[in-house]
Structures are given as structure tokens and as C-alpha cells.
Amino acid sequence: MTGRAGTRPRTPVRRGRDAVPVLVGALVLVLAALPVERTSVPAAEAAVFRVLNGVDVLPFVLVWPVMQLGNVLVVPAAALVAAALRRWRLAVGLLLAGAGTYLAAKGIKDVVVRGRPDGLLTDVVVRGAAAQGRGFLSGHAAVAVTVLTVAWPWLGHRGRIAGVVLAAAVCLARVHVGAHLPLDVAGGAGLGLLVGSLVLLVVGRPR
């Protein structure tokens, strides 16, 4: 019989409260962008940056791989893994969110113009190659949070904890190496949550 539960097609689930992360992401993005100025850094932000940039916790050879979890190439890689596991909606969602985040980040960089920390502050410790281009917002932070947000409904408890830790590590690492200021990564995280949550509204959650 085709009416048995085991043979029913799995339809995506959409809930009204799924719009809440969209609003939270948008709020974080806006609040991070408002204090940003082209030629100066707010005193509180500079103080936080000095702490994160000045401390030596791990050697760069260990920090660098963590940062790559926010590389844009993580998106197609994660989508391929999802497809290999036959999680088709997850794979499509990751690709949509990755493309949306990339395009949105480019647009925001043209509107909220700010340079890199070493062009705005003195005595910045740059670890690895100096980052180029505009500083706000952090694409690495945006990608890491986007991937986590889209994958969230498919993750178990431990997977969610690991995902949050890794996404936070990407954000902190970008400040630590001198590539971004704190508001840059906050804005990137907000964008990632915003876009990822919007995509979940489109593709739906698994039952």
C-alpha cells in the first residue's frame, strides 16, 4: 500500500518561529555596521581587538586550518558531503546560502567601507599573509555561520555544539591574525545567520 508511513514522501517542515533567526541575524548585522567609520575605530572595539590580536594561544600553523573552515570553498565541499549522504535539501540549501552570502557580502563591502586593522590601528600583529581589500564584513565569519545555520536542523546535539565552537573559532581567529576587527566578524556572523535562516525558510527543515 502506498499510504503506509514508511513509503510517504518526506516533505519539508516550515515553522513560523523559523523567521526569528532571520530577524536576529539582520539585527546583529545592522548593529555591527552602525558604529563603523572609514578612518577610525571605536575605542571599545579597539580595546577588544588589542586583547584578541595580542595574545598568543596557539601557533599560526594551527590557527590557519581553523580559519579555512570559513573559506568559501567549504560551501561546495559541504554540499558534496550532503549529496553523498543523500541529504538533497541540505545540499541545495548550502549552495543557495553560499551564493547568497557571497553576493551579499560583496554588496555590503561597497556600502560599509572600512579598511583592515593594520591600516586603521598601530602596532597590529599580522600573522601570516596580510589580508587585502575592505575589512567590513568578514567573509570567513559569514561563510562559517551560514554553513552552520543551514546544517543546524540536520545536526545532532554534539554536532551542533561542535559547529558553534568551530564557527566561533573562525571568528576569533580572523581577529587574532589581524585580518579583521571585532565588528567585522560580528557583521559577518549576522549576515551568515540572516542568509542561512532565509534559505531554511525556502528549503524547509527535515521531519
Where are these regions (language model features)?
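N-terminal transmembrane-helix/juxtamembrane module of multi-pass inner/ER membrane proteins
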Residues: M1-V74, K109-G128
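Structural signal for the C-terminal ends of transmembrane alpha-helices
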Residues: T2-P9, V81-L90, A151-G156, L198-G204
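Aromatic-anchored segments of alpha-helical transmembrane domains
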Residues: V30-A33, A99-G107, V165-A179
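Membrane-water interface at transmembrane helix exits
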Residues: F49, A105-K109, V113, W152, ...
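Membrane-interface elements of multi-pass transporters and channels
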Residues: V55, L85-W88, D110-G119, R158, ...
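Hydrophobic alpha-helical transmembrane segments of integral membrane proteins
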Residues: L96-L121, H180-L194
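Membrane-embedded catalytic cores of phosphoryl/pyrophosphoryl-handling enzymes
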Residues: T122-R207
